[in-house]
């Protein structure tokens, strides 16, 4: 963390300006009531090749399309203009063949241009390749020898050249047997000025020459270029200064900002790239080993080619360099279920299992084993710090459960020390026999995190631990803002408090090149010469740097929410990947009088809906399907109907209290989460915003009619099925402050973390019970913003960043005023 120290006098002035605001609430912390320990593994990072996080990001390679493989398509795919169409495969859950389209480049040779098209031409060829694994090479034919010809690469939106720094060029060139010219390597500014020049000495005409040389630019250019004047198989340019000075290494500033998060582990390689759009373009770790020039790369799930430069060995080495454990995510023979969702034949499961076992052996196997020996050949005979294997990524359903059990049994038998993670969420573990950890994911709006800090409080213990592998506030926050960061800080407080259950967490996605945003909100932004953390980055850093040894109990974990009224809104039906029918729909008011309905009138339809003789039918597997009824707005009514599930994974949705545009309200998600749980979720921006209140175990049988009834009053709703109360819900305002407290045994400090998400300062009285003595002088670390809409930028990269100060007003009981829109950590010496 870049710490900014404030003199005590400045802090005293800040506090005295709020002296008239008396605390309305008291936080009582009892150090004798020890809570859950907080695992040293709690905070890690998750790397996936998305947003050019690797190529053009963490990976230090400066040349785009260095091996000329960018136009290679996955098997069975085809392109039409700038659209790539995947292979038609059968989704293993729905049985449907999904349509899909992904971006594709129309550049004839991506990343490369000729300075003059009249004097030369270029084309891709596979004639006599240097490496069969990366067979494409670029053939440049010079038609007019009197004109200098430059083959130019502009890198990933520019090549960052720094004056007097050294750059390592490697190129593999095969001149024609009758070529009499010379080849010169140039580093150019954005305007074309030559900043460095070096001859490339060809030693063998008609053969491949693998050549390396160093170059130093005479000036700095953030958007420089590399040029070769003159067949080319490979061109690579690396800064000499990489992270830990490793060849084929990582961009130093990007790796250092990741190291600044103090990650306990690194999850790799994904993410959806693990599965691929379909299995044809899944990430294949074995192809990421060895000479970078021989690596084929792969068209990524996220719409561009991944070079495999930041490969398996490089990831493991990075973990060792930053003292983090490694997590490998394997493919179980399933394509991405949010995309094509194909499954390998059962006969191929052994292939995918063997591939996973080989990956483990490469990381930690003895040098006498096949893959341990290959690791040693790469200069690392000692085992790498692999500790976790996640079996699949975001997979679900019976087919996944079957394959998970196969993998779990085989891996545990050979490597019992490894921690194995399933893709299941909080809704249940399906049909699997056993898992060490589950991995729920959340990409949500701020209200979800604010409203769900207690989501783990009553979750069953003893069967497995929890790894929250992907989470972020990324809805209704633009590219990210302070409100998103504060909601994440609040959610983190709940995860820390439940440290006996939640052992690991990682924000996602991690990195974004500003020139290619594939995902709305990301933790760290970069371009060719700059890297910066969003406000959320500093929340993650502060949480990791101030992790207590264990929690201590307090009288409250949030400020008191207030009971609210449901909106006088519309109601409707829906489903998620499920075919469902509704009939005998009846609506009555608070006085018991019937209310006329015309189900033909709908203000919103999503999915395949039909209405025939009072039977409302949804026949698609849309996620979600919606049918919002027009003609009624209210918050005091009884809705009765019959419902039947006809097929699919889940139950049904019952919307109510929806706004005029149907974008805000509530929904009963009945038998959701793989037909295992019923809960009420908020609706914000037309999307479910997460569970609001309790959840109960509940499922529906296929092909069975149920009598359903929803009773709504302004401050309460109840759902009945076949006359039995399933769930009740009361709307509440979103809490504005959140608290967590713990003790650091190494320093003898109480750690108090407070989120204030409102626009006013928040005065709080803090009382420390169960202590003999408290030192008056301690430390305050605070992250705050003038507005919750604020965010860091390339122009103001430290606009929202932690400020650390000394504070001399601590005691067994003390008042502290927390700034508006702030995340504050108090460290108080106590024993």
What label would you give each PLM region?
Residues 27-118, 245-270, 553-613:
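Extracellular carbohydrate-recognition regions
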Residues 190-221, 673, 687-705, 787:
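Extracellular carbohydrate recognition and processing domains
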């Amino acid at each position: 963390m870049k710490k900014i120290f404030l003199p005590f006098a400045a802090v005293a002035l800040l506090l005295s300006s709020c002296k008239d605001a008396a605390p309305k609430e008291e936080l009582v912390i009892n150090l004798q009531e020890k809570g859950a320990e907080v695992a040293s593994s709690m905070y890690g990072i998750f790397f996936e090749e998305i947003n050019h996080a690797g190529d053009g990001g963490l990976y230090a390679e400066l040349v785009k399309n260095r091996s000329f493989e960018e136009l290679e398509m996955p098997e069975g795919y085809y392109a039409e203009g700038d659209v790539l169409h995947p292979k038609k495969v059968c989704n293993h859950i729905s049985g449907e063949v999904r349509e899909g389209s992904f971006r594709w480049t129309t550049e004839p040779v991506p990343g490369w241009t000729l300075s003059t098209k009249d004097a030369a031409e270029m084309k891709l060829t596979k004639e006599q390749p240097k490496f069969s694994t990366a067979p494409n090479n670029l053939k440049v034919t010079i038609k007019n020898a009197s004109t200098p010809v430059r083959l130019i690469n502009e890198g990933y939106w520019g090549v960052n050249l720094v004056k007097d720094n050294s750059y390592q060029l490697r190129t593999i060139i095969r001149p024609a047997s009758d070529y009499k010219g010379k080849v010169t390597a140039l580093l150019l500014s954005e305007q074309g000025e030559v900043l460095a020049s070096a001859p490339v000495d060809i030693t063998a005409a008609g053969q491949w020459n693998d050549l390396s040389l160093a170059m130093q630019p005479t000036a700095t250019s953030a958007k420089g270029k590399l040029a070769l004047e003159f067949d080319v198989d490979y061109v690579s340019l690396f800064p000499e200064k990489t992270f830990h000075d490793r060849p084929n290494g990582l961009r130093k500033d990007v790796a250092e900002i990741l190291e600044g998060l103090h990650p306990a582990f690194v999850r790799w390689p994904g993410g959806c790239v693990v599965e691929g759009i379909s299995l044809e373009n899944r990430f294949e770790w074995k192809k990421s080993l060895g000479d970078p020039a021989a690596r084929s790369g792969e068209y990524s799930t996220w719409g561009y080619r991944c070079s495999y430069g930041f490969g398996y060995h490089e990831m493991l080495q990075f973990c060792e360099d930053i003292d983090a454990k490694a997590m490998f995510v394997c493919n179980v023979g399933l394509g991405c279920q949010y995309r094509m969702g194909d499954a390998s034949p059962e006969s191929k499961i052994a292939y995918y299992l063997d591939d996973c076992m080989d990956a483990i052996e490469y990381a930690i196997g003895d040098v006498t084993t096949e893959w341990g020996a290959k690791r040693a050949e790469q200069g690392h005979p000692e085992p790498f710090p692999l500790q976790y294997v996640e079996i699949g990524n975001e997979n679900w359903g019976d087919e996944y459960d079957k394959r998970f059990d196969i993998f779990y049994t085989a891996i545990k038998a050979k490597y019992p020390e490894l921690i194995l993670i399933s893709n299941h969420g909080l809704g249940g573990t399906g049909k699997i026999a056993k898992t060490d950890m589950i991995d729920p994911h959340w990409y949500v709006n701020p209200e979800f995190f604010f409203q769900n800090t207690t989501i783990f409080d009553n979750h069953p213990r003893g069967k497995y631990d929890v790894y929250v592998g992907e989470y972020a506030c990324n809805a209704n926050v633009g590219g990210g803002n302070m409100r998103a960061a504060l909601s994440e800080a609040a959610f983190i407080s709940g995860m820390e408090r439940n440290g006996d259950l939640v052992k690991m967490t990682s924000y996602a996605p991690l990195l974004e090149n500003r020139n290619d945003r594939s995902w709305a909100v990301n933790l760290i932004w970069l371009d060719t010469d700059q890297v910066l953390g969003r406000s959320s980055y500093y929340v993650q850093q502060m949480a990791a740097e101030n992790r207590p040894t264990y929690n201590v109990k307090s009288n409250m974990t949030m400020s008191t929410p207030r009971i609210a009224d449901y909106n006088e809104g519309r109601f409707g039906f829906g489903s998620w990947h499920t075919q469902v029918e509704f009939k005998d729909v009846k609506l009555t008011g608070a006085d018991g009088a019937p209310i006329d309905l015309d189900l033909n009138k709908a203000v919103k339809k999503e999915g395949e809906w039909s209405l025939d003789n009072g039977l409302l039918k949804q026949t698609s597997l849309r996620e979600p399907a919606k049918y919002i009824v027009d003609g009624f707005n209210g918050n005091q009514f009884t809705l009765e109907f019959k419902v039947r599930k006809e097929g699919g994974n889940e139950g049904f949705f019952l919307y109510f209290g929806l706004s005029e545009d149907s974008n805000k309200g509530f929904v009963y998600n009945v038998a959701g989460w793989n037909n295992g749980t019923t809960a009420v979720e908020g609706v914000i921006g037309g999307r479910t915003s997460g569970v609001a209140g309790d959840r109960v175990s509940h499922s529906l049988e296929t092909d069975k009619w149920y009598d359903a009834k929803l009773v709504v009053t302004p401050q309460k709703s109840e759902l009945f099925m076949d006359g039995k109360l399933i769930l009740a819900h009361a709307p509440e305002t979103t809490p504005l402050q959140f608290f967590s407290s713990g003790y650091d045994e190494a320093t003898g400090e109480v750690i108090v973390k407070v989120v204030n998400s409102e626009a006013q300062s928040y005065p709080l009285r803090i009382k420390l019970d169960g202590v003999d003595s408290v030192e008056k002088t301690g430390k305050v670390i605070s992250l705050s913003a003038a507005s919750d809409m604020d965010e860091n930028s390339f122009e103001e990269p430290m606009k929202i960043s932690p400020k650390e100060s000394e504070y001399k007003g601590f005691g067994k009981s003390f008042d502290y005023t927390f700034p508006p829109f702030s995340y504050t950590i108090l460290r108080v010496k106590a024993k």
